[in-house]
UniProtKB/Swiss-Prot annotation:
Alphabetically ordered keywords of this record: Cell membrane, Electron transport, Heme, Iron, Membrane, Metal-binding, Oxidoreductase, Phosphoprotein, Translocase, Transmembrane, Transmembrane helix, Transport
The species this protein was found in: Homo sapiens (Human)
Cofactor: heme b
Binding residue positions for heme b 1: H50, N115, M116, Y117, S118, H120, E180
Topology with respect to the bilayer: Multi-pass membrane protein
PANTHER family registered for this protein in UniProt: CYTOCHROME B561-RELATED (PTHR10106), PLASMA MEMBRANE ASCORBATE-DEPENDENT REDUCTASE CYBRD1 (PTHR10106:SF12)
Effect of K79S: Decreased heme b reduction by ascorbate
The protein's assembly and partners: Homodimer.
Annotated effect of mutating H108A: Loss of transmembrane ascorbate ferrireductase activity
Name used for this protein in its record: Plasma membrane ascorbate-dependent reductase CYBRD1
All ranges on the Extracellular side of the membrane: 33-47, 106-118, 180-197
Catalytic activity: Fe(3+)(out) + L-ascorbate(in) = monodehydro-L-ascorbate radical(in) + Fe(2+)(out) + H(+); Cu(2+)(out) + L-ascorbate(in) = Cu(+)(out) + monodehydro-L-ascorbate radical(in) + H(+); monodehydro-L-ascorbate radical(out) + L-ascorbate(in) = monodehydro-L-ascorbate radical(in) + L-ascorbate(out)
Organism phylogeny: Eukaryota, Metazoa, Chordata, Craniata, Vertebrata
Length: 286
């Protein structure tokens, strides 16, 4: 199936991948060139894992996981395969985020630095917890087969909305964290004097912001949504199911030969309205 605005989508996707990759490279260059490298000994070198893993996992990989359903060359793949890829990318992002949080707490505890006093730490920990809950609920409800269809229909809009909110929160938290680190670390020369490290990390923040904006734009364009699979089951919040229009119409016609034309026309119209309304809840925005 052809995608509307295919080349525009490719341009935005390529831009997002480029900016996201540059964000990861900038984070690595920052800690390796300006912050003396990486380690796992409780020192500042261990803390340096925090920005690298957060930018790599919680920003870049999570962003790719959000838009993976929208890649048109995957539309011929089964929905189960795409769900597995989506869940796998989010699981990798979650693991990297957890390791980065552990690095911060270990560094603070070894050096007797207080934990969880800044807004960055509050919002960041909330984002990690919500992300883990989102991952667990998504795996349990949408990937495993035993969840009732009515539960999936009810949770799908919540899953989509909360995923976008969490990603936006992560972007904001990353920007707060970069600024906080520069204020604490840059003393001579001070951050206010535009030192090279300050300018470099500010640029990293802009890259993260642009990456987030591109992901938001891609994931909110309805014309780039993964098309509904033929003969797929549409979920009703009341627990019922409806087959895709092509697969259901012949059976419908055969079972209603005794009905009048007016009754058939009214039921067909009602069914089309229900399909249009329910399809929004069935297909993930992502």
């Amino acid at each position: 199936m052809a995608m509307e605005g295919y080349w525009r989508f490719l341009a935005l996707l390529g831009s997002a991948l480029l900016v996201g990759f540059l964000s990861v490279i900038f984070a690595l260059v920052w800690v390796l060139h300006y912050r003396e490298g990486l380690g796992w000994d409780g020192s500042a070198l261990e803390f340096n894992w925090h920005p690298v893993l957060m930018v790599t996992g919680f920003v870049f990989i999570q962003g790719i996981a959000i838009i993976v359903y929208r890649l048109p060359w995957t539309w011929k793949c089964s929905k189960l395969l795409m769900k597995s890829i989506h869940a796998g990318l989010n699981a990798v992002a979650a693991i990297l985020a957890i390791i980065s949080v552990v690095a911060v707490f270990e560094n603070h505890n070894v050096n007797n630095i207080a934990n969880m006093y800044s807004l960055h730490s509050w919002v960041g920990l909330i984002a990690v917890i919500c992300y883990l809950l989102q991952l667990l609920s998504g795996f349990s409800v949408f990937l495993l087969p035993w969840a009732p269809l009515s539960l999936r229909a009810f949770l799908m809009p919540i899953h989509v909305y909360s995923g976008i909110v969490i990603f936006g929160t992560v972007i904001a938290t990353a920007l707060m964290g970069l600024t906080e680190k520069l204020i604490f670390s840059l003393r001579d020369p001070a951050y206010s004097t535009f030192p090279p490290e300050g300018v470099f990390v500010n640029t990293l923040g802009l890259l993260i912001l642009v990456f987030g904006a591109l992901i938001f734009w891609i994931v909110t364009r309805p014309q780039w949504k993964r098309p509904k699979e033929p003969n797929s089951t549409i979920l009703h919040p009341n627990g019922g199911t409806e087959q895709g229009a092509r697969g259901s119409m012949p059976a419908y016609s055969g079972n209603n030969m005794d009905k009048s034309d007016s009754e058939l026309n009214s039921e067909v119209a009602a069914r089309k309205r229900n399909l249009a309304l329910d399809e929004a809840g069935q297909r993930s925005t992502m």
